[in-house]
Design a protein with these regions (language model features):
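Transmembrane helices of ABC transporter permease
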Residues: 10, 14-27, 58, 62, ...
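An intracellular "coupling" helix at the cytosolic face of ABC transporter transmembrane type-1 domains
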Residues: 10-13, 98-102, 118-131, 135, ...
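Membrane-integrated ABC transporters
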Residues: 1-29, 36, 44-59, 65, ...
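Juxtamembrane helix-loop junctions of ABC transporter transmembrane domains
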Residues: 20-21, 25-41, 53, 62-109, ...
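Short intracellular "coupling" helices and adjacent cytoplasmic loop segments at the cytosolic face
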Residues: 46-47, 82, 90-114, 118-120, ...
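ABC-type nucleotide-binding domain
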Residues: 326-604
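Helix-loop-helix
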Residues: 47-57, 147-161, 231-313
């Protein structure tokens, strides 16, 4: 937890006052056995009722002061722990937002959710208990021993011998349990991930009648977590009985020695009661300490896992504003000297990309250029690298080799904000958030007017969808847009990107749920936009990209062909195969046309 202590810096006062008031509570608690001994040895022995009443009110005062100190300590501990957890959770969330897709792919969504919720809650609980009890228990144990020595040196030696044995037991159990708590949290990650996967894909599971297999797999993982939890629980449970045995042995020895001293006249009965009370206080606090150590072990394991997230550094760096301005001036001068650079919106120069730990590149030696205002279609088989290519344009990933240019400048020279403002992305999976349609559309541009929103909806063929909803723009969407159909969600996500009025618009197979008529109307509307936009259309439908100015054909990560529809039908086997698989009636016509062309050439 040491590396996370920085998030306590705004709660230094609370972190000091909480144990301080616990210390005051300990002082008041340690006075109580002495007062009780005085009541027995003086008040009762001398039949002095006045003395007994006086000491009784002192006991009441000590109890009241102890209670007030305890409540105050709890207040400061709660304030510090809750504030710490809030800042830590925000810091982790902010850190995750700045990680590149490479790190997010490596960490996994389920791991991040567990660490942002369960792990941070464990750390918060550990800090709260630590501030209240971590010092209180040692204070009581050591204080009881000191007070015992003030009563009788020989009897107090029992305390001095028992305490080291108790701490040895605590240390041994802690030594073995800490690594196991880390394993428990790891198993919890696995169960969380499996739960999320199965609940997300529950319709697919039922469609393939895989319920039994899904339940069996979950049961296996859950049993692994349960068995490990039981083992750790049994190990931790040893703490209390072993502590009790040692304390009870010490108590028997204490009473035996104290009884002998009373018979010899070296001690009074009240002092024996005081010694026993101090021993009882030690028992209670050592039990609390045992529970505290278990909690702190869990917190330490969780703190380490949270710290691991904060240690992950993004492999993607963005330039500072000053560096960016200087680079822009330099690149503008270069672009002015070379007119071709200023005409191109996007240029790929021998780009190769490989996902982390993939073992093979997903894109290899890709080169092409796109002029401003052009529409580019990207087509290819499953796994050919279509989404990967457009992700490089958005700089969700950095190219492993080669360069990607935006407006004649290396895309890595743009600041994050400037790059995002230029590019509008509609991903494959339509993602909407809980809130009104208006709130979701304004993700594109916060200052957009309702007129801008309706204009974007009209272009995205989503106007009728919104007009048919109660409240229209104020219609509330459920999480991930569950109260909309797939096609409706896609149209809203396209509209959200259009609200931004980006220079580069990327539609990553984002019209797959639209019928052919709506898809055609969408493409027609995109061609009539009132600003100059370069559009990238990723699609499985060759009909969706036939009218594109440039079509890129990908095959297993390589650029199999590029050109217009007519050019690719003549020159690219991969494109012909895709096209004719979707329009088989065209194959015969193409064959007859090709044969006629060959005969004509032979005749000539």
């Amino acid at each position: 937890m040491r590396s996370l202590a920085v998030y306590l810096k705004n709660y230094k006062k609370e972190s000091i006052l909480a144990p301080f008031f616990k210390f005051l509570e300990v002082v008041f608690d340690l006075i109580v056995p002495i007062v009780i001994a005085q009541i027995i040895d003086v008040g009762i022995a001398n039949h002095d009722n006045k003395y007994i009443v006086q000491r009784f009110f002192i006991l009441i005062l000590m109890a009241a002061l102890g209670l007030a100190s305890s409540i105050t300590a709890q207040f400061f501990a709660a304030k510090a722990s809750v504030g710490f957890a809030t800042k830590l959770r925000q810091a982790v969330y902010d850190h995750v937002q700045h990680l590149s897709f490479t790190e997010l792919d490596t960490l996994g969504t389920d791991t991040l959710i567990t660490r942002l919720t369960d792990d941070i809650n464990q750390v918060q609980n550990g800090l709260n208990m630590g501030l209240r009890l971590l010092l209180r228990s040692p204070f009581i144990v050591l204080g009881s021993m000191v007070m015992a020595f003030t009563i009788d040196f020989k009897c107090a030696l029992v305390f001095a011998v028992a305490i080291p044995f108790l701490f040895l037991v605590v240390f041994v159990i802690m030594f073995f349990s800490i690594p196991l708590f880390k394993k428990v949290q790891g198993k919890l990650d696995t169960v969380t991930g499996l739960t999320r996967e199965n609940l997300t894909g529950v319709r697919v599971i039922r469609a393939f009648c895989r319920e039994k297999e899904a339940v069996a797999e979950f049961d296996t993982r859950n049993q692994e977590l349960t068995k490990l939890n039981l083992f750790v629980g049994k190990l931790s449970a040893l703490l209390n009985p072993v502590t009790y045995v040692l304390i009870n042995i010490a108590t028997v020895i204490l009473i035996q020695k104290a009884g002998v001293e009373v018979n010899l006249g070296g001690m009074q009965q009240g002092q024996v009661v005081a010694l026993y009370n101090y021993m009882a206080q030690m028992i209670v606090e050592l039990i609390k300490l045992a529970s505290l150590i278990i909690t702190l072990n869990k917190s330490a394991a969780s703190a380490g896992r949270v710290a691991d997230i904060l240690k992950v550094k993004s492999t993607m760096d963005y330039p500072s504003s000053s560096t960016y301005s200087a680079q822009i001036s330099k690149d503008l001068a270069t672009a002015t000297a070379d007119a071709s650079l200023s005409e191109n919106a996007i240029v790929f120069n021998d780009v190769t990309f490989e996902y982390s730990k993939a073992g093979a590149p997903s894109l290899s030696h890709i080169s092409f250029s796109v002029k401003k205002g052009q529409t580019v279609g990207i087509i290819g088989g499953t796994g050919s690298g279509k989404t990967t290519l457009v992700n490089l344009i958005s700089r969700f990933y950095d190219a492993s080799k080669g360069t990607v240019l935006l407006d004649g400048q290396n895309i890595e020279n743009y600041t994050r904000s400037d790059l995002r403002s230029r590019i509008g992305v509609v991903p494959q999976k339509a993602a909407l958030f809980k809130g009104s349609i208006r709130d979701n559309l304004k993700w594109g541009r916060e200052d957009a007017s309702d007129e801008d929103l309706w204009q974007a909806l009209t272009t995205a063929q989503g106007k009728e969808v919104v007009e048919g909803k109660p409240g229209q723009l104020d219609f509330m969407l459920e999480q991930n847009g569950k109260n909309l159909s797939g096609g409706q969600k896609q149209r809203l996500t396209i509209a959200r990107a259009l609200v931004k009025k980006p220079e580069i618009l990327i539609l990553d197979d984002s019209a797959s749920a639209l019928d052919f008529a709506t898809d055609a109307a969408l493409r027609k509307s995109l061609n009539r936009l009132d600003w100059k936009v370069t559009t990238f259309l990723v699609s499985q439908r060759s009909s969706s990209i036939q009218q594109a100015d440039l079509i890129l054909v990908l095959d297993n990560g390589t650029l199999a062909g590029k050109g217009t529809h007519a050019e690719l039908l003549r020159t690219c086997d991969t494109y012909r195969e895709i096209y004719f698989s979707q329009f088989p009636e065209e194959r015969a016509r193409y064959s007859s046309v090709s044969a006629g062309s060959i005969m004509k050439e032979v005749t000539v």
